[in-house]
Structures are given as structure tokens and as C-alpha cells.
Amino acid sequence: MSEQSQLDDSTIDKLIPQIFNEMRSNLNNTTNKFPKSTGGGASDNISANSNSIRSFNSITTQSLLKESESLDKITAMIKNVTAALKNNLPVYVNQVHEVCKSTNSILDSWINIHSQAGYIHKLMSDQTYLKLINDRLHNENVNTNDEDGSTLHNVIALKKKEILDLRQKLENRKGEKDAAPAKPPNQGLNPRYGVQSGRRPVPSAGISNNGRVRKTHVPASKRPSGIPRVTNRWTKPTASSSRKMFR
């Protein structure tokens, strides 16, 4: 076992053909030892068995040799394919890169065309733009020497002037608001009544808003009544109070 473990692949590759050759030579020697006989018997059986063994071994050996030749051809083909891929891979990568660049440029052009088409559709749906175009065409028909498109330029100048005027007004409003002094907290109060101007003063007690004298509010416990009040619990009630109680 130690000797077999020490054998490497190259040694095994060299020993396999030698083993097959020895087996073939031994088979030939065994077949030559037995003479051919015309009669039946053990010699005929031995020769038949030897012939079958020799044919089987020859078929197995031939098939192994053919497989070995096929493997050698396949190995050579794989080597050729690997070499071709190594040499042509950068070229293929460059071709793929160029195809991707051209595809991206086509897509960018299509996106630009689509955006411009959408912008033109939006302009053609705007009535103001159509009116300006019609005015310009009318002006060109009337004044053939007008090369600057004065109608369109005049409209644009007017729009710019309006925008500048609005900005100036906004800045003036902001300046006035910043320059205005802050009002004190008690400004706007009437010094006589201590209330804000524009509001009616609160009337004093006993005088209503229309100038009439109001009656003072008297609690119910202090209002006069016909029933006498008993201050002492042992005081005997009078006859008049009794009659009022049982009436």
C-alpha cells in the first residue's frame, strides 16, 4: 500500500500501457500452448473459451484506445477555443461598448425630440402664443421691410416692463412697512374713559345707556313682606300672623 500511495499520475500513465501490453502477450501465449484438434472434447472447449476471452479483451482495448484518441482531440479543441477567447475577448468587449454608446446616443436623441415635441404641442395650445404669431404674420404682410418682428419684440418689451413695475411696487411697499414706526401698546385709548376710541364707554352704576335711571338690585332676603320676622325662637306669634299662615 505504501508503494502504491507513492505513485504519482505520470507514473500511472506510463504503467497503464505496459500492463495492457503484458496482458495481450500473456493472452497470446496461452492460446499458442493449446494445439488445434479436429475431435470434440476439452481441447475444443478451451480453444473456444480462449478465443472469446481474446476477442473481449481486444474489443475493450480498442474501445479504450478510441476513447483516448477522442479525448486527445477534444482537449486540443478546448485549448484552441480558450486561446481564441483570450485573444478576441478585448475585441468583443470593445464592440459591445461601441454598440452601447450608439444605443445611448440614439435614446438621448429620441428623448430630446420627444421633449421638443411636447413643448411645441404646449405652445400651439396656448391662445396667447397663437395670437402673437398671427399678429406678427399680419405685421409682416403689412410691412414687408420689417425684419426684426417688431410686434413680437414690442409685446415682450411690454411684458418685461410690467414685471419691472410690479417688482418696484413690491420693493416700495416693503420699504414703507420697514420705515413705519411701531405703535405703543396704549395708543388709541381714550384718556377720559380708559377705553379704545370708537367704542362706547361703560356706563356708571344706576345709569343705563339710554340715560334712564336703573333701580338698584336688592336681594330677596332684604325685600319687605307682610310676614313678620321672628328674631327670638320663644316669641309667641301674633294672631294676625297666625291667620295669614292658615288662610
Curated annotation (Swiss-Prot):
Variant or mutagenesis effect after changing A117T: In DUO1-2; produces abnormal spindles resulting in growth arrest at 37 degrees Celsius
Keywords, comma-separated and alphabetical: Acetylation, Cell cycle, Cell division, Centromere, Chromosome, Chromosome partition, Coiled coil, Cytoplasm, Cytoskeleton, Kinetochore, Microtubule, Mitosis, Nucleus
Any one GO biological process: protein transport along microtubule to mitotic spindle pole body
N-acetylserine modified-residue sites: S2
InterPro entries assigned: DASH_Duo1
Effect the entry attributes to changing M124I: In DUO1-2; produces abnormal spindles resulting in growth arrest at 37 degrees Celsius
GO cellular component: cytoplasm; DASH complex; microtubule; mitotic spindle; spindle pole
Effect of A157V: In DUO1-1; produces abnormal spindles resulting in growth arrest at 37 degrees Celsius
Protein localization: Nucleus; Cytoplasm, Cytoskeleton, Spindle pole; Chromosome, Centromere, Kinetochore
Region entry Disordered, spans: 27-47, 172-247
Domain of life, source organism: Eukaryota
Major localization listed first in the record, in broad terms: nucleus
Bias type Polar residues, positions: 232-247
Coiled coil location: 152-180
Subunit structure: Component of the DASH complex consisting of ASK1, DAD1, DAD2, DAD3, DAD4, DAM1, DUO1, HSK3, SPC19 and SPC34, with a stoichiometry of one copy of each subunit per complex. Multiple DASH complexes oligomerize to form a ring that encircles spindle microtubules and organizes the rod-like NDC80 complexes of the outer kinetochore. DASH complex oligomerization strengthens microtubule attachments. On cytoplasmic microtubules, DASH complexes appear to form patches instead of rings. Within the complex, DAM1 and DUO1 may form the microtubule connections.
Function: Component of the DASH complex that connects microtubules with kinetochores and couples microtubule depolymerisation to chromosome movement; it is involved in retrieving kinetochores to the spindle poles before their re-orientation on the spindle in early mitosis and allows microtubule depolymerization to pull chromosomes apart and resist detachment during anaphase.
Family the entry assigns: Belongs to the DASH complex DUO1 family.
Note: Present with 996 molecules/cell in log phase SD medium.
Name of the protein in its database record: DASH complex subunit DUO1
Organism: Saccharomyces cerevisiae (strain ATCC 204508 / S288c) (Baker's yeast)
